[in-house]
A protein has these predicted regions:
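Active-site-proximal beta-alpha loop/turn segments in soluble metabolic enzymes
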Residues: 22-31, 60-69, 100-103
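Phosphate/pyrophosphate-binding betaalpha-module
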Residues: 1-52
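Short beta-strand segments
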Residues: 4, 12-14, 60-64, 96-97
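A glycine-rich helix N-cap at a beta->alpha junction
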Residues: 1-10, 80-86, 90
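Short, contiguous, pocket-lining structural segments
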Residues: 37-41, 50-51, 70, 74, ...
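Amphipathic alpha-helical segments in well-structured domains
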Residues: 75-79, 114
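Phosphate-binding glycine-rich loops and their immediate beta-loop-alpha structural context
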Residues: 40, 46-70, 76, 87
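A glycine- and small/hydrophobic-rich beta-loop-beta segment
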Residues: 85, 92-171
């Protein structure tokens, strides 16, 4: 939390103990052929997000041939359900529907995707990655009451400065 407070960003992963019942519920969904049940999908996702204790949440709901939600209608239903669950739990929640019928960016694989993200932070990178990054950041800043333009932070180097401080401080 100290790095988050001083730098304003941190990379972390939730442990399996965050929402321990989720794994069992997924196995039950698999056994009962309800893996595609939107209320259960949303409950699984939001149980972990709410358990994190966040005040605001921006969700990127993918739609298209490369996504779990193949149609706009199902993606909208999932987004509405996710936002509703978040709001009921007292978490300011918004969701963007983003296309996933073609790959995002030009990289495939963790290491090269991180490299591509660093290119975006440095003011470059593929246009579609920049567009999505700015849209998600704009939503998160608005949800947090911050009146900043993330595109400006990319252009003037502030985003890269925060990245470097975060990497340095996290070791």
């Amino acid at each position: 939390m100290e790095i988050l407070d001083t730098v304003g960003a941190v990379i972390c992963a939730a442990g399996s103990g965050l929402a321990p019942a989720d794994k069992k519920l997924y196995a039950l969904r698999d056994t009962t052929s309800t893996v595609e049940c939107i209320p259960l999908i949303a409950s699984s996702i939001m149980s972990k997000k709410i358990a994190e204790g966040t005040d605001s949440l921006v969700l990127d709901v993918k739609v298209g041939t490369g996504a779990f939600m193949k149609t706009q209608e199902r993606a909208r239903e999932l987004a509405r359900t996710l936002v509703g669950l978040g709001e009921q739990a007292g978490v300011r929640t918004t969701a963007l529907l983003t296309e996933m019928s073609v790959p995002l960016g030009r990289a495939v694989g963790n290491a090269v995707e991180v490299e591509e993200a660093v290119q975006v932070l440095a003011g470059g990178g593929p246009d579609d990655v920049v567009e999505l990054t700015v849209a998600l950041a704009r939503e998160m800043l608005a949800a947090s009451g911050v009146q900043e333009d993330p595109a400006e932070a990319l252009a003037d180097g502030r985003a890269m400065d925060v990245w470097r401080r975060m990497i340095r401080d996290q070791g």
